[in-house]
């Protein structure tokens, strides 16, 4: 018997944040897609603004490209930014490149980038 969409959503709702991150990564790999691309494509369609292409970006994703040499400091910075536990933050850093924060304001994204780079990480804003 196949699982219904409702069953799948309920199973995802019971997962930890790190399990969901790993699930998304596995789905991206299996299906050859990117979750960030789906959000970027869906956002203009939801807004319905044809002239929105020239508008300034208001939401940013903070992507940890690599932890660099000071991995412990980067894990501490990730914990401070996200509020994750030690294990979850370590898994996020070990899984780089990985999203640290998604859909945040430019100021929040710049602050997170600054903290991570001071800790020794390479960071991208998208």
Swiss-Prot record:
CC terms in the record's Gene Ontology section: cytosolic large ribosomal subunit
What Gene Ontology molecular-function terms does this entry list? mRNA binding; structural constituent of ribosome
What InterPro entries does UniProt report for this protein, alphabetically?
Ribosomal_bL12, Ribosomal_bL12_C, Ribosomal_bL12_C/ClpS-like, Ribosomal_bL12_oligo, Ribosomal_bL12_oligo_N_sf
One GO biological-process annotation of the entry reads: translation
Keywords attached to this Swiss-Prot or TrEMBL record, sorted alphabetically, are: Ribonucleoprotein, Ribosomal protein
SUPFAM superfamilies hit by this protein = ClpS-like (SSF54736), Ribosomal protein L7/12, oligomerisation (N-terminal) domain (SSF48300)
Q: Tell me which Pfam families the record gives.
A: Ribosomal_L12, Ribosomal_L12_N
Return the HAMAP family for the record: Ribosomal_bL12
Similarity field: Belongs to the bacterial ribosomal protein bL12 family.
Q: How does it assemble?
A: Homodimer. Part of the ribosomal stalk of the 50S ribosomal subunit. Forms a multimeric L10(L12)X complex, where L10 forms an elongated spine to which 2 to 4 L12 dimers bind in a sequential fashion. Binds GTP-bound translation factors.
Query: What's this chain's function?
Result: Forms part of the ribosomal stalk which helps the ribosome interact with GTP-bound translation factors. Is thus essential for accurate translation.
Query: What is the protein's name according to its record?
Result: Large ribosomal subunit protein bL12
Q: Which organism is it from?
A: Saccharophagus degradans (strain 2-40 / ATCC 43961 / DSM 17024)
Organismal lineage? Bacteria, Pseudomonadati, Pseudomonadota, Gammaproteobacteria, Cellvibrionales
Gene name, Swiss-Prot/TrEMBL: rplL
